[in-house]
Amino acid sequence: MKIKKIVLEKWIDPALISHYLTKKFGDKGLAWLDSDGKENGEWSIIGIKPKKIIQSRDINNLDKTNNPFNNLRNIEKGFWIGWLSYEAGVYIEPKNPWKKSNMATLWIASYDPIIKCNLIKKEIIIEGTN
């Protein structure tokens, strides 16, 4: 996979970027990993219009196709943004009493390109394969 990077000349606050992209494309699939701009929070990353979404749900059905850890092992290379819930622990500790939940145990989406905002250097990088 050949990755291309474009560094924008002008700084734009990630909140404004996210707001603009939401107005233009809608918020379905929008992912914004925000940071505080301190030493350990240098980057905010934004993805819009995912190419692919993978979810794992139903902690009462512990089959292999629903296992979030199997789904993570099988993803292709790319720019993925998402989360793994605390309840995914049911696949590691199935005998513990887990509460039923409608929330996904895994939600990840593939984006191409992504927008990386360096909050310390005030630099915006668009990174992708096309």
Model-inferred region functions:
Residues 1-130:
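Signature of the chorismate-utilizing enzyme
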